[in-house]
């Protein structure tokens, strides 16, 4: 009997160690089958394509951002229930959206609800899974190559891969993500990853100034070009290691993107404009290129809120083209009565700059009692709208997004 108890105890201990190693430590054995990596989504020139049986079909992203907070709870408590998520998913799909975007790993209830909802619907919702570094780290004194920044970002990337495949235990992650046991594999509905959520421009600028002569990163899946800055090279390295992890552990790939916004857009503005808006940093994902081993592809993602700082409103219409190497047609950005649609014009500039698909991953209008800011040209602001007015602004923004040539938003 004593030997039996010892034997059972040893088996339980080994199972526990194995569980912790796989679900908490990320332990796996490399399959070594690089030529067997699969994907159901890829890019081709400026289009996103989804595999439907044996046919690749263009996919227009009609998305909705989803935060982690509800009234009466801190967003970092991740307090939304499965039942609430299921109700929201139904409403979101009825509104015409086909994609969700979340900023970080949500609570296990989200992935359980997402799995359950899609398993019961012929037309699924897709997911763009975000990964971030928290604001405390981004606004600290360190540059992006400090372990508290680069190391934490990479850790979050690898944890996120395990989460969407239903193989992760998160005990404590400094509020960067929720916690819990993730057992639902939702990977077949995950279009891709968006790394970052609005990089702090001063951190980007500080990193680039500190390492002006850094050798560009050369990876297996992603490579930084000779023109890449130090921060862009860090992004290439992070994305490359994330792709390696998913490719070798799960034999899968999906799209990848590095978030940006107008504070870090790739354009070189006139001196007076840059000084007025305190524009100090640039991120150009065209400086991050894919190798043949990255079969899914990249897309460019921008926060494109209509009330954000509007460089074009301070520039003459005739000077907009000075920001591009191409001759861009902005004629439909001027109404018959002479009003300028600087929102559409800026999005077109972004789209024409890139060789990859471009998504506006964050835009909208709020219904709060007070208005924080308003675009002086388009009169689209943040707050003080009725729900009807809010809906009209959302429709107008989306029409501008598609008219500018983006792949959705």
Task: Label every PLM stretch briefly.
Residues 26-119:
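Active-site-adjacent substrate/metal-binding segments within catalytic domains
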Residues 15-34, 310:
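Membrane-interface motif at the C-terminal end of an N-terminal transmembrane signal
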């Amino acid at each position: 009997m004593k030997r039996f108890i010892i034997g059972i105890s040893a088996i339980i201990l080994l199972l526990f160690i194995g569980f912790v190693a796989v679900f908490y430590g990320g332990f796996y054995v490399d399959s070594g089958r690089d030529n067997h990596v699969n994907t159901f989504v890829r890019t081709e020139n400026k289009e996103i394509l989804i595999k439907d049986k044996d046919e690749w079909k263009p996919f227009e992203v009609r998305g909705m951002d989803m935060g982690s907070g509800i009234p009466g709870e801190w967003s970092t408590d991740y307090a939304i229930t499965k039942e609430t998520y299921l109700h929201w998913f139904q409403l979101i799909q009825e509104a015409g959206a086909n994609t969700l975007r979340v900023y970080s790993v949500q609570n296990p209830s989200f992935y359980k609800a997402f799995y359950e909802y899609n398993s019961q619907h012929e037309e699924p919702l897709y997911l763009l899974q975000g990964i971030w570094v928290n604001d405390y780290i981004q606004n600290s004194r360190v540059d992006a190559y400090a372990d508290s920044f680069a190391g934490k970002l990479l850790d979050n990337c690898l944890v996120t891969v395990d989460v969407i495949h239903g193989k992760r235990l998160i005990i404590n992650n400094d509020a960067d993500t929720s916690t819990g046991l993730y057992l639902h594999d939702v990977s077949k509905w995950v279009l891709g990853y968006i790394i970052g959520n609005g990089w702090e421009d001063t951190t980007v600028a500080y990193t680039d100034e500190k390492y002006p002569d850094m050798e560009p990163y050369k990876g297996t899946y992603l490579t930084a070009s000779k023109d890449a800055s130090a921060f862009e090279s860090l992004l290439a390295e992070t994305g490359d290691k994330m792709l390696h992890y998913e490719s070798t552990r799960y034999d899968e790939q999906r799209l990848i993107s590095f978030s940006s916004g107008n504070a870090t857009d790739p354009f070189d503005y006139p001196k007076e404009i840059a000084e007025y808006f305190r524009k100090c940093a640039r991120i150009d994902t065209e400086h991050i290129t894919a190798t043949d081993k990255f079969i899914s592809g990249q897309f460019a993602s921008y926060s494109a809120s209509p009330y954000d700082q509007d460089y074009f409103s301070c520039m003459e219409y005739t000077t907009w083209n000075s920001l591009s190497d191409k001759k861009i047609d902005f004629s439909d950005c001027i109404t018959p009565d002479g009003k300028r649609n600087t929102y559409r014009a800026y999005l077109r500039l972004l789209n024409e700059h890139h060789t990859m698909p471009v998504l506006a991953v964050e835009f909208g209008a709020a219904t709060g009692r007070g208005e924080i800011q308003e675009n002086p040209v388009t009169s689209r602001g943040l707050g003080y709208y009725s729900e009807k007015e809010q809906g009209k602004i959302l429709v107008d923004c989306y029409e501008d997004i598609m008219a500018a040539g983006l792949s959705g938003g």
